[in-house]
């Protein structure tokens, strides 16, 4: 096993990365190694998809399958070895079918790629594990050096994050042929084990630019289906009655669950990155969507154990449900998996509903505690003139975007302290699950504008980017000239690709934490600082002084 993709990876003087029987996330060495094999198979599939495009063949099934299967290898998504193997088998079947179609047009065609003809050596996991050793991500690290290896991981993990957003968009009926073509090109290229520093850096930025377009179609899919988010009060305390908890990012799953639970007397609660759903008009119209439960994903083993109903996981993040003894009432969807728990293949949530009806639910309602969500793209753009007026009249000094991933590291208290320290003449935008570090605090208002604006899920960084672009256009300056600072927390691969997106757009002077990614060497961090001014967080006082100047 070798995995260095998340923030909690093992770090030692000898090197960074989880390389024992189990990773810090709970992923076994078996699952990790099989995921490496799956990635290699998917790289070969993408090589064929590129070749097919040259012949005018575009296989929409492959275009949707490839990023979905890649998504299953993200942190805290799928821990089920059998399902990882099934993805690899399906990929090879799709590749074979595509090759047949290509050879009907050109019987002599071959694909010049080291993984183009990769086959699984057997059906049994022990044999596949032996085969997977050929594709360990650190196999040639000693040969190419830490910097080249780190850049490869930056591209690979960034592309994983983009693949996740591609799948979220696909679920909502959104696709783009150019995006799929770029995805296959980057995926196939990574399978050649690239060694050129400039190419690696340029393609990392290319992946970021591609992801901007992915976030755009995802935003389009969400708003076309459910309307533009509106500022909405959300109760974060339990309400008496039977209950189902839904976690992850998939708004379509939430919509289907709300439809299927109408009239049952079951209350639906969001968790984690599903919180922003309350701002969408077509979702918040359901009266049994009663609130949000819990905090950051890392606390789920305690919080889920106390939840008196079934839990539906629609995407990341899932961690070991056996710790809290709730494995019998957690249900996984789509690419999510944990060995031995219930998995739903179709769109019928009847088993979940039946389980909820058989449980007690919450015995009483607690006193309401309301927070506000729903400051999405359109709401932010509509507020642009107000923001400009407040800045011009010197009533608004600075805007901070403080958000990103949450996690268990104690250093993450920095983000709570930072938000608390933001002066009263400044406002905070936040997004993703990092908001749980401070989103239940009362920040008040500034000239009628809430000082804390919850922009949405991690992919809603797109909304913040669009606001920054509009403000810069109206003020006749660059985004980097705005009184705007980004203080971002990262944990996994979606955060990596959002960072690449921001850098590819030329956004500079981003503060990141709580630690640097384990795959980025000191040399690479120095390059990112030199090119983009990106720097690790230090102390709240020091960083605030550097940003505001006093």
From Swiss-Prot:
The record's comment on cofactor binding reads: Binds 1 [2Fe-2S] cluster.
Q: Which residues carry this modification: Cysteine persulfide?
A: 405
Catalytically driven reaction(s): A + NH4(+) + H2O = hydroxylamine + AH2 + H(+)
* BP-aspect Gene Ontology terms: nitric oxide catabolic process; response to hydrogen peroxide
Q: Which UniProt keywords apply?
A: 2Fe-2S, Cytoplasm, Iron, Iron-sulfur, Metal-binding, Oxidoreductase
One cellular-component annotation, GO: cytoplasm
Residue positions binding [2Fe-2S] cluster: 3, 6, 18, 25
EC class, as a word, reads oxidoreductase
EC number, as in UniProt: 1.7.99.1
Under InterPro entries, the record lists: HCP/CODH, Hydroxylam_reduct, Prismane-like_a/b-sand, Prismane-like_sf, Prismane_a-bundle
What's the superkingdom here? Bacteria
Query: Where along the chain is hybrid [4Fe-2O-2S] cluster bound?
Result: 249, 273, 317, 405, 433, 458, 492, 494
Q: Which HAMAP family match?
A: Hydroxylam_reduct
Question: What is the role of this chain?
Answer: Catalyzes the reduction of hydroxylamine to form NH(3) and H(2)O.
Q: Which NCBIfam families match?
A: hybrid_clust (TIGR01703), PRK05290.1 (NF003658)
Q: Which family does it belong to?
A: Belongs to the HCP family.
What is the protein's name according to its record?
A: Hydroxylamine reductase
Task: Tell me the organism.
Answer: Yersinia pestis
